[in-house]
UniProtKB/Swiss-Prot annotation:
InterPro entries, per database record: Amb_V_allergen (IPR005611), Amb_V_allergen_sf (IPR036712)
GO CC, alphabetical: extracellular region
Disulfide bonds: C26-C61, C33-C48, C40-C54
Name of the molecule in the record: Pollen allergen Amb p 5b
Keywords: Allergen, Disulfide bond, Secreted, Signal
Subcellular location: Secreted
Signal peptide as annotated in the record: 1-22
TM stretches of this protein: none
Organism: Ambrosia psilostachya (Western ragweed)
Length: 77
């Protein structure tokens, strides 16, 4: 265990359980992305871990995660 900070964040999920699991995995990847703290989301309509994008602030992350959620359809697995 190195000197890693625990990053807490509000979970932005969707009404689809499968989506929530995938988005949560994306956030987990974001917390270890790069050498600085990262907040994670993915490109609109894409899921992590294939498309991981890290942001420097929670505000940017929340904005992009909300955008992603709007673009993801429930029949995507």
């Amino acid at each position: 265990m190195n000197n890693e900070k625990n990053v807490s964040f509000e979970f932005i999920g969707s009404t689809n359980e499968v989506d929530e699991i995938k988005v949560m995995a994306c956030y987990a990847a974001g917390s270890i992305c790069g050498e600085k703290r990262g907040y994670c989301s993915s490109d609109p309509g894409r899921y992590c871990p294939w498309q991981v994008v890290c942001y420097e602030s929670r505000k940017i992350c929340a904005k992009n995660a909300a955008k992603m959620r709007m673009n993801v359809t429930k029949n995507t697995i």
